[in-house]
Amino acid sequence: MTKWKRANPNGTRDYLFEECTLIEEVEQKLRLTFLERGYEEIRTPTIEFYDVFAFQNRPIDEEKMYKFFDEKGRIIVLRPDMTIPLARVIGTQRWDTPLKVTYSGNVFRANESHSGKYNEIVQSGIEVIGIDNVRAEIECVISVIQALQKLKVQSFTIEIGQVQLYKCIVKKLSIQDEEERVLRTYIESKNYAALSNFIGEKKLDRCDETVRLLEKLPRLFGNLEVIEEAEKLASSNEMKMAIARVKEMYETIEMLGYGSYISIDLGMIQHLDYYTGVIFKGYIYEIGEEIVSGGRYDELIGNFGEMLPAVGLAVQVNQIVKALQEQQEPYERNQIDIVIHYELNRLAEAERLRNLLRKDGKNAWLSLFSNLSDTFQFARKNKIGTVVEAQNEYLVEYVWNEKWVVQKEGEASCVTFKLR
């Protein structure tokens, strides 16, 4: 029964000290950036009913959910996604739109063992509800670019795709569900040979414009030249409108001076089926994992109530932290300047002295040791050069000079006690 008591479950880990601090700092900077842009905060429970995620098309595989039962025998899950619970909140209440919301929290997915993915991650994100025009997508992309800039993330790119274009191609070529899932993996992985074999096995006419567009799809990534190629092969108004939306987004964001942070990838297809239009993925060159994901999901909220257009994105906080650790100087824990040793009856005076020193910019630390010799040993181990002792009647300052020597003594009150 105690076999696993010293281990973490697969896909989880402990976060310690400076890494924990960095996670909190990243979350807070993202939060403040989004609040400055007019987003309002929403928090949803860590646990949700399984039914929240079990609607048509099952956007999240059942096998990836952590499931258990509540006191009434109902199936509960640890939330595997942040957007779907938010859609539940929006869909089950009446709101004045447009609505801009932000969130942050942990997400849980049971990934395959040895996949290299963590089963518990931290996400911070934004959603724009009730707007169906391209301004909503532009707002999301600009917001996340500014947030990443404030975090001083280097060498990142936000890729813009269009899942509606892919869906139009699949529909026009009458590709069925099972085949579509296979096709999706070929395009996403840019497996040109497998895609060509798929087209051959399906006996699709390679002279047909839509088939040619399908075969080119994994190669359509880069700048506006990609849009021009796609436009030449678009065989329906719906395809042309989908491509035009990406073009309008790209041109507008470029005009605002953020062109170096964006690129186009029409072969990008999100793994979550609830996306209906423009989609986003963000990457940092130093790490292979995505740091941003999202897109438009105009049909999702309708599963819970009124049908409302929406677009949003999530920032993968853990991946941001990983990148910052690689890009920046090693994190240094706050150096303690002074340790205050005290008798218990002098704790109030020691606390007042600590507060006074902190106001003067000193990092003062109350000793947890009852013996002065132990406090001295702690100070030396942590390269702290000053110890103040609050004795029964007065304060004593010690400094390290090859040994601990008295620098000053005699003051009874911390108000009059001044360090050298």
UniProtKB/Swiss-Prot annotation:
Q: Does the keyword DNA damage apply?
A: no
| Pfam families registered for this protein in UniProt | tRNA-synt_His
Q: What is its main location?
A: cytoplasm
Where in or outside the cell?
A: Cytoplasm
An example Gene Ontology CC term for this record: cytoplasm
- List GO BP terms, alphabetically: histidyl-tRNA aminoacylation; L-histidine biosynthetic process
**What keywords does the record list, in alphabetical order?**
Amino-acid biosynthesis, Cytoplasm, Histidine biosynthesis
Q: From the Swiss-Prot or TrEMBL record, what is one GO molecular function term?
A: transferase activity
User: Coiled coil: which residue ranges?
Assistant: none
Please give the pathway this protein is involved in: Amino-acid biosynthesis; L-histidine biosynthesis; L-histidine from 5-phospho-alpha-D-ribose 1-diphosphate: step 1/9
Family, similarity comment:
Belongs to the class-II aminoacyl-tRNA synthetase family. HisZ subfamily.
What subunit structure does UniProt give? Heteromultimer composed of HisG and HisZ subunits.
Task: Give the free-text miscellaneous remark of the entry.
Answer: This function is generally fulfilled by the C-terminal part of HisG, which is missing in some bacteria such as this one.
| Function, in words | Required for the first step of histidine biosynthesis. May allow the feedback regulation of ATP phosphoribosyltransferase activity by histidine.
Protein name (Swiss-Prot/TrEMBL): ATP phosphoribosyltransferase regulatory subunit
